[in-house]
Every structure is written in C-alpha cells, then in structure tokens.
Amino acid sequence: MRLCGPLSNAALLFFLVLFGVPAIQAQQNAAVPTFQSTTTLVFLDITVVDKKGHIVTSGLTKDDFSITEDKRPQRIFSFEAPESHAPNKHASDDTPDGNAPTTIFVLDQLNSSLEDFSFLCDQMQKYLEDQPSHLAAPAELMLLGNRTLELLQGYTRSRTDLLFALKHVPTETPYKNIPAFKDERFFQSIQALQQIALQNEAISGRKNIIWIGRGGPGTILAYRNIYSVDKLERFVHQTTNMLVDARISLFLIFPGLKVQEINALPGSKTADTTIGLDPFGGDINFGGFVNESGGRIFYNENDVDNLIRQSQRLGAEYYTLTYHPNESGSAADADGKFRHIRVTLRNPDLQVITRGGYYAPDESHPIDTEKQTILNVSQAVQSSIPYTGLAMKVDSIVRHPESRSADVNLVVQSKNIHWESTEGGKSTANLILLAVSFSSTHQILASKLQGIAFSATTQDQAALAGLSLKASVTLRVPYNTRSIRIAAQTEDGGGIGATDLNRQAIDSLSTKAAPAAKISPSL
C-alpha cells in the first residue's frame, strides 16, 4: 500500500488499520519455535518502606509477603531480594543487562511554562553534576517537546554524555501550554508513555521513568459522547498494560503544585483504592499511570535534584515477586475490568509501593494482533527515539528515478525473532514492516506497509538466533524527501526495530537501477 502526498499521523494510522497488511511476500531464511502459554505470570516489583519512609532491603523473605488479586489470595511463584538487582558498578557496557533497573529521564517541555522548564533543567543539571562520572546503571535522557518525544541521549553510564545532552536541549517556546491545546497535550503525553514502553519492552528487568514536569492534563468524560468515552478508556487501559508488560514504573516530579491542589491532582488516589474502583473512573488523568505502574508523585517541593535522587532510589531497591492468577484463562477473566492487586506484609509497620493492578482482556473488544502490530510499528516509525528490540540496518538502496521510488534492502538480525516450527524440520517467522518518507517538517510524503515471511531449514534455536536475514521494501521517495524511517515488528508482537536514513545517507547508499530494456516491435 502506498500513501501519496503529505499525511498527518492520524491519517496514516487510519489507513494502515483500515486496510491492514498486504499478503505476506515470501523471503528467505530464519526461525525459532514459538511456545504458547495458557497461563499468565504477573511480575510485581515491590519497594518496602517503614513508618519513617526508610527503604527496607533486608530481613524479609517470601513468607513475609501476601498477595491478593480482587480479594483472591494468590500463591507466590518466585521471590527475589533487593541484592539480586544490585548494579555492577564496574560494568563498562552501556547496554542494560536486565539485572539493575535502568532510568529514563523525561524533560516535560510540552506541559511546562518557559520559566518552569528552565528551572527544571537547572535542577536536572545539579543532580547530574552530583553523580559519579561512571553511573552504576545505564540511563537515557528524553525531551517531550511541542511536536515529538525526542531521545537526546541513549542509554549510557557516562555522566558527561548526559550533561552534554542536557546543555544542548533545543530552546523552544512551549506554545501548546494553553487551554486551546489541552486535548492535544493529553494525547501527546500519554502517547509518549506508549512510545517509551514500546522502546523498552525487549529490555528485561525493571525500568523507571523519572518524569520531570507536570505531566499531561486530564480530561473530563462528562463532556464527551459515549463512543468517545469508550475509545478513550480503551486507550488508557492499553497504555496501563503496556507499562505493566514492559515493567516500567512512572515517577512524576512537579515542584510547583500547591498543597491545596492535591485533591485535583491526577492520580492522587493511593494504590490501595477500594476494591472494584477503576483508577481511571471518572476523569482520565496522567497521574493515574503513576499509581498503576508502582511509582510516586512528588509535589510542592523545590528541591528537585533531591526528589530525582529519591525517585531513583525508590525504583532501585526493591523485591520482585511473581504469581499466576488463580482464575486466569476462565471465561469470567475476559471482562476487560481492572484487576486490583494488593500486597501486604506480615509486619504491619511496613508498607509497600508497587503497581495497583492491570486490565484484563476484554472479549467484547478482542485484540486483533495484526492491527495491534500495525499500530505499534506506526508509532515507532513516527517517533524519533530508537527501537532496538529487533536489530536491523539498511544495506543498500536502488533508486528508480523514473518513478521516484527506491528499493531499500535491509539486513535483519534474528536474535529476537519468534519462530514457529513447520513440517520437514523447517521454521518460519513473519514480520510487519512499515517504511515512511518524511519532508524537512516531518510531513509524511509516502509510506509502504508490507508483511515479510522468513523461512529456515533448521529448528535449532542457537542456529536460528544467529541468522542474518535479508528483506526489501520498495518505497516512493519524492524529490523533497529529507529522511526515511523504517520500523518492523514480528507479527506475534515481539521486539520492535527501527532504522533511519537522512538525505545524505540516502544519496550515499543509492545506486541507480539500470533502465528497462526496450523491446523492438516484431516485423
């Protein structure tokens, strides 16, 4: 499918979901057997504090914890003490190792005044300057601006790299911080959470978002029609589950909030809300994601660098418990309702900070895995942040000047691809790939969505994981194209990968296709 002419992001999503993926085209190589599970394993990252708010990291065992889901006791399947997540202070690799939690700093320019944002950046700089030159665990720095979520610095252990990125934050007036743009900021802020979840879903272990700024505005459901309310609630439920699935906790730091405003604060409810109360019931709000992801809101304090430090510690010293829901898989389990999780300790003087629950599948709105994958790659291709869950790069480009199109040839590493065994000792895997040509103002000039099938003559998982696979997509490249971004995900919702080409790279990798042979008319 080709979309010609400038398109908005919403239009791209509409066309992709409406028309879906064309028939998968056979390609070569690849595959690992996919193992289906009929049970769900729920992960809980739990920070324990005493009455004075001090973090408790020792003296507790599996038997000290009790878990209920909607008042039903759950049997603890596994238990990890905080020392299991201790960072390797001597590690030199910037890649998250899945043991120590990683930190994602988000500077919220979109929802801040110019003065507030300047203050928040100064406080962030103060915090970083107080850190060791080599961080104990990788961290990355993002900026939520007027139009996009931008990755300023990818995962690194270098304080110098983070400070450099911070000092070069683009100067921009947050013009959307007015009532006329309230809805736009609401969606942009929540979509930023979705993008971060997609980017990090292939990274094992806990991730902590430290969101520096107010966060997105809430919305009043009474002002919307029933159809709109239903779509909004499903949008929020999906975002909650994306954070849960990626094991992300959200910490929100907004120093300018007055104490008397706390009842109006998004997500001001605690995670111990009355059973059956939907945390997004009534108004949909950004702070609800804090509670349901096991984070915390900090407000009415100007010591932001210390609050960042507190957030990082709360997200770094924790127990991990897992359990299989007792009635998972039953017909009553697919009602789409919120599953309230409560964790208690044998010692009543101790309290826990953990996520409040998750949303069950909804049989009245069944998940179409193909459409969900299309939505995922559409978000990834319109984002500027890297996606490394699926390693891929452009190998070459063959231009067709007569049609202003190009064949983009890719190499995809099979490490995170899910394979299925087939007859004759073979394996197969399917990808959904989306390529987009962008103008200098990030308008969508052209796009191509297609399915790609890989096959391999082995079922050996080690051999399959080491394959380099070839794929190709033909995309229109109009004369005013300034960049191309290609995103892909396995059809069953595995890791997402993305690769980018600026105009210089497009030209340097390109070769011109030979002109088509002319056929002489027969005499």
PLM region spans:
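Scaffold/interface architecture of coatomer-like assemblies
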Residues: Q25-L523
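N-terminal secretory signal peptides that target proteins for export/translocation
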Residues: M1-L7
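Bacterial N-terminal signal peptides
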Residues: N9-P22
